[in-house]
């Protein structure tokens, strides 16, 4: 069995593959012996927009519909921009493959990197053991050292939760304020 290593960017995935001894480039991933390295291409999974909550009637802009509040029923979707949906399908297929028994988060070492990884894994519905590859440099020796000192992904879970809380707060404030301001502004014209 092998490890599925998910980087945030293609360039980081290439550097990790090189540190693993190179590999065979496939469509959206790199095979490195029993391991595979793929990339997220940024945010592959995002929150729905208000219009996409079909059951809430938020597609009509009115003050009566405010505040928009999906709390308790937040929904996620695959990002359809810049070919992200195609890359998501590649990553999801690898996540579901029996060839990989351990997932490795090699996304950027920050809250957003944690969030990007966890959104993909959660949306794909995968439950496998997870490790964290904390890469601070793309030098091969630094990557090899990081590969030798990986820790449980659980130790970094708080970073992903903080990023998701920020994303939901941004959504609540941004979507409600934008609609309220637009509706009030158009009434005055």
Description of each model-found segment:
Residues 1-185:
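Intrinsically disordered, low-complexity regulatory segments
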């Amino acid at each position: 069995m092998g490890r599925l290593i998910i980087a945030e960017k293609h360039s980081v995935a290439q550097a990790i593959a090189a540190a693993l001894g190179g590999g065979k480039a496939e469509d959206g991933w790199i095979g490195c012996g029993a391991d595979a390295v793929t990339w997220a291409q940024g945010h592959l999974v995002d929150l729905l927009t208000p219009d996409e909550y079909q059951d809430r009637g938020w597609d009509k802009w009115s003050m009566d519909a405010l505040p928009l509040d999906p709390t308790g029923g937040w929904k996620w979707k695959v990002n359809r921009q810049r070919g992200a949906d195609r890359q998501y399908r590649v990553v999801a297929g690898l996540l579901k493959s029996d060839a990989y028994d351990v997932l490795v988060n090699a996304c950027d070492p920050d809250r957003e990197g944690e969030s990007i990884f966890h959104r993909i894994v959660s949306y794909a519905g995968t439950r496998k053991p997870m490790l964290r590859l904390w890469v601070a440099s793309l030098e091969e020796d630094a990557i090899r050292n990081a590969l030798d000192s990986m820790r449980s992904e659980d130790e970094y879970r708080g970073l992903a939760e903080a990023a998701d809380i920020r994303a939901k707060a941004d959504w609540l404030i941004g979507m409600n304020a934008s609609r309220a301001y637009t509706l009030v502004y158009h009434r005055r014209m």
